């Protein structure tokens, strides 16, 4: 069985993580956050990638695609090796740019199927406010206004064109993420009930 993938995209603070947790609970997907995998790998003293990842994340730059894809692939392989039925994955925060997408197509072509892109559309100011709130408790070094403005710029320049590309293929499910968590999840449920 091939992994079935839903790419989850949206700016920082659009609520991707929160919604993914609910999708996992209700639909039995496995949630893979590209950012979290990179942050965990960065903390792993045995990692061959640790220092490199640290440097990129600190500078708010996008980590080389080979690293991200190898971490995603490793997780998918391990999950499916443990339980062959668990072949549905939410990949959150990836692909971030053209380079990511090309890397994915090159490495994963024929090895995984992308069902659709779940796009959480959210006003920048709302996203910033949410992240600043989260920064008080998350301990994430990149949840401060300056870093956020940079992340939103990167997102708009790099990720938005990817969403547009999938839009042309009719593969984007767009959700208004500025609403409350429950209202947003209602929209998510409508999509997953239809798409599986």
From Swiss-Prot:
Main localisation: nucleus
Residues bearing the modification N6-succinyllysine: 106
Requisite cofactors: Mg(2+)
Cofactor note text: Binds 1 Mg(2+) ion per monomer.
EC annotation from Swiss-Prot or TrEMBL: 2.7.4.14, 2.7.4.6
Signal peptide: none
Catalysed reactions, as listed in the record: CMP + ATP = CDP + ADP; dCMP + ATP = dCDP + ADP; UMP + ATP = UDP + ADP; a 2'-deoxyribonucleoside 5'-diphosphate + ATP = a 2'-deoxyribonucleoside 5'-triphosphate + ADP
Region (LID), start-end ranges: 133-143
UniProt-annotated stretches for the region NMP: 33-63
Protein name stated in the entry: UMP-CMP kinase
Organism listed in the record: Homo sapiens
Lineage: Eukaryota, Metazoa, Chordata, Craniata, Vertebrata
Gene from which this protein is expressed: CMPK1
